[in-house]
Amino acid sequence: MPSISPASDADRALVIGSGLGGLAAAMRLGAKGWRVTVIDKLDVPGGRGSSITQEGHRFDLGPTIVTVPQSLRDLWKTCGRDFDADVELKPIDPFYEVRWPDGSHFTVRQSTEAMKAEVARLSPGDVAGYEKFLKDSEKRYWFGYEDLGRRSMHKLWDLIKVLPTFGMMRADRSVYQHAALRVKDERLRMALSFHPLFIGGDPFNVTSMYILVSQLEKEFGVHYAIGGVAAIAAAMAKVIEGQGGSFRMNTEVDEILVEKGTATGVRLASGEVLRAGLVVSNADAGHTYMRLLRNHPRRRWTDAHVKSRRWSMGLFVWYFGTKGTKGMWPDVGHHTIVNAPRYKGLVEDIFLKGKLAKDMSLYIHRPSITDPTVAPEGDDTFYALSPVPHLKQAQPVDWQAVAEPYRESVLEVLEQSMPGIGERIGPSLVFTPETFRDRYLSPWGAGFSIEPRILQSAWFRPHNISEEVANLFLVGAGTHPGAGVPGVIGSAEVMAKLAPDAPRARREAEPAERLAAE
């Protein structure tokens, strides 16, 4: 098959995968003078942040909210653009409601006073402890997000320097342990500790550094992009094309090519070879090392080492539309979390035992409350997400056999909050861990790549600059700083600090630098 002309290789950068991390990487590389080509096996950019439309119902397939809009504004500014001119964000308040089987509920808002009132309503004796929790969260936000999360952690010395702060902040405690230290009510302990599930982590084992999410929500609020996260992905693609970048959709990369220890391009599944001066992989880090670099000897990220990591849970997601339901179930807002009778036991079944439990907790997304474009007039669009085991088990769940019975169980839970919903369901689509494995090439169908435990965070994660191959960079959920929209956008920011400017940009800068020196 033909290769790109060598004369054009040096200034070309290839980005494997058009998830939000890959798109952010492409934007930042374009700002550094690279001519970027983004390659993805899907038909539209966005990866998990893309959408599918059926019968007028648009289903946002992955992330549903934006918690740190400033990270996107900074990204656009780097490219000489205005994010708010390209994407409309709408604040959501309340952020979500947490419900328990006993009928009690906890409404999460941005206002500290409103939150303290909610805590007092549930458990008056826990208000003082909640205030301490907020202070703890703020400290970890400034260190864990604004500092650690925005710089590279690829050198061991980077880790050694921060160990005293980790110790001072008791990063050895889990998120749940820290919540339990501050409040006594088990419902509040759950409400203050479940956030790691949003990025694939077990609240009973993930480091307490992740309580910073409470401060993130308080600092920036929770926002919804009109048009869904897919609208953000589409806007990112337009910026890339405006920089002179291009896309190869419906195109799968089979291998990263390495010559004398340096990444020089990729071979596509079709056999075509694309050469480049720089390669960025937004594919899952496990897929990058085990599959795309399968023919290259690796020192650290061997197949055995990748397989030995703890992986995030899988996801069962049911996307569906309902007919004539606008205005029904007014107490079910944009986001609702419906808890199972068990918390710790269910989490252990998912993360430690690899067992598909009969009970379930659901994250219910009803974007039609906020965005009329997601459904036909008078209708609603939903998705219901249930955390489930990934496929890296001795006896993985056979989703071909159990997906439909499990969906029926999800419907039974939904009926408790929205009576009669089953009679009004229209278009329907189900994603299981097998879908994540096949559609997104996610190892073992994990929803969020490598789980963010303390010994799988920062330096311990696959680095943004590859340890195995020169000229290869990694972005996305499996790298530093981690999963979630702020995490993958941040991974591209870290990558850009490590990647060089394009050769042509350096050449163009030389005369100006000489004049300045004179």
UniProtKB/Swiss-Prot annotation:
Q: What is its pathway? A: Carotenoid biosynthesis
* Residues holding FAD: 14-47
State the function annotated in the UniProt record: Converts phytoene into all-trans-neurosporene as the major product, via the intermediary of phytofluene and zeta-carotene, by the introduction of three double bonds.
Q: Please give the InterPro entries that the UniProt record associates with this protein.
A: Amino_oxidase, Carotenoid/retinoid_OxRdtase, FAD/NAD-bd_sf, Phytoene_DH_bac_CS
Q: Name the cystine pairs.
A: none
The protein, known as: Phytoene desaturase (neurosporene-forming)
Keyword flag rRNA processing:
no
